[in-house]
A protein has these predicted regions:
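C-terminal cap/substrate-recognition subdomain and adjoining C-terminal extension
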Residues: 1-77, 81-83, 160, 167-336
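Active-site neighborhood of HAD-like aspartate-dependent phosphohydrolases
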Residues: 60, 71-131
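A general boundary/transition motif marking the beginning of the first structured unit of a protein
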Residues: 91, 134, 146-150, 233, ...
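Residue-level signal for pocket-adjacent positions within structured domains
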Residues: 89, 144-145, 215, 226
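A metal-dependent, Asp-based hydrolase signature
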Residues: 99-100, 112-184
């Protein structure tokens, strides 16, 4: 049976699977206590990992490709506005495809886990892309499997491997247009954060390589530098992303009305709705419709045939956990 690609495609149609379609109707999820916890934990982690200005400046020296489109608002971003910042989703916004899938490839190559585990997570991602919504039972199953694989592994080990995997699989997948938008904010003296369901340490590697300020990502617990196999809250997805941005903005004394956010997914509408300058980047059908209805800015850096993204929860909520096996779920919640 052919494996799905990083974009969730395969040689056979997953819709032939026997499904119970009643639960597939999309539902907007409100913020829960766990999503608030996940957001606050991610914001705290992001602030800690971003407090290394010399390292960030060194990473920021990377050559940047000019923007592919002229900004629609020449006066934006506003130079010198210390209370403004920009928040970028990762998968299919900053980079093409699912970052965690590629981290998984790198760990599988290093015999970090078995082929059957890679196959299982790949099919889970494809399934959720086709389904177009989330099911608590399936998410819980993937979560437990992913966390069981990283349990007992050292954070430093997986961070080191993640650096190598970035060079092997991710560096060439960055959208130059989105990268230029991020650089415009940096050049204006603003801070720029990735906001992703990917593990926060994985996201931090990518942010550092791109010269960004830091990253908000899914937070997993570690004790003594070793993963415990538990998450702090829930994956940073949907409402949890909005909570993370809200918490970080409060801690950093940012004015969200002066901030910008960028995403490809309708699942990030809560985050996009928080800021004064929301942008739909390479948008899926639902986000494109919402953006047009609300007069949001759109950018599309895809060329040729546009990839149809049906079930973003796979790449974000569930895919982050599946890839979290691959890349190692991130940050440390130390216990006494």
């Amino acid at each position: 049976m052919p494996l799905p690609t990083p974009d969730g495609k395969s040689g056979r149609n997953p819709l032939r699977m026997r499904l119970s379609w009643e639960w597939l109707a999309p539902r907007r999820r409100p913020a829960t206590a766990r999503s608030v916890l996940a957001g606050e934990a991610s914001a705290e982690a992001a602030r800690k990992t971003s407090q290394a200005p010399e390292e960030a400046l060194e990473a920021g020296a990377t050559e940047v490709t000019p923007a592919e489109e002229k900004p629609a608002e020449p006066e934006f971003p506003v130079a010198g506005d210390e209370r403004a910042a920009a928040f970028f989703d990762l998968d299919n916004t900053v980079m093409q495809g699912a970052s965690l899938f590629h981290f998984g490839r790198g760990l599988y190559k290093r015999k970090f886990f078995e082929r059957r585990e890679l196959t299982r997570f790949a099919w889970q991602q494809a399934y959720f892309r086709i389904a177009g919504t989330e099911d608590a039972g399936h998410i819980q199953d993937v979560r437990e499997s992913a966390l069981s694989i990283v349990k007992g592994h050292r954070v430093a080990e997986l961070m080191s491997i993640g650096e190598e995997i970035y060079d092997e699989y991710l560096a060439g997948r960055i959208w130059s247009g989105t990268r230029a938008l991020a650089q415009a904010h940096l050049d204006a003296g603003q801070r720029v954060w990735l906001v992703t369901a990917a593990p926060v340490e994985t996201a931090t590697i990518i942010a550092r390589r791109l010269g960004l300020t830091g990253a908000l990502g899914t937070v997993a617990e570690s004790v003594g530098g070793v993963y415990t196999g538990r998450l702090v809250g829930e994956p940073l997805h949907g409402p949890a992303k909005a909570e993370a941005v809200r918490a970080l903005a409060a801690a950093e004394e940012l004015d969200l009305d002066r901030c910008a956010a960028y995403s490809d997914s309708h699942n990030d509408i809560p985050m996009l709705s928080l800021v004064g300058h929301p942008y739909a980047i390479n948008p899926d059908t639902k986000l494109r419709k919402h953006a047009r209805e609300h007069d949001w800015r759109l950018r599309d850096y895809r060329t040729g045939r546009k990839a149809v993204k049906i079930g973003i929860p796979a790449a974000a909520g569930v895919g982050a956990l599946a890839g979290g096996t691959a890349a190692a779920v991130a940050i440390h919640r130390r216990r006494a």
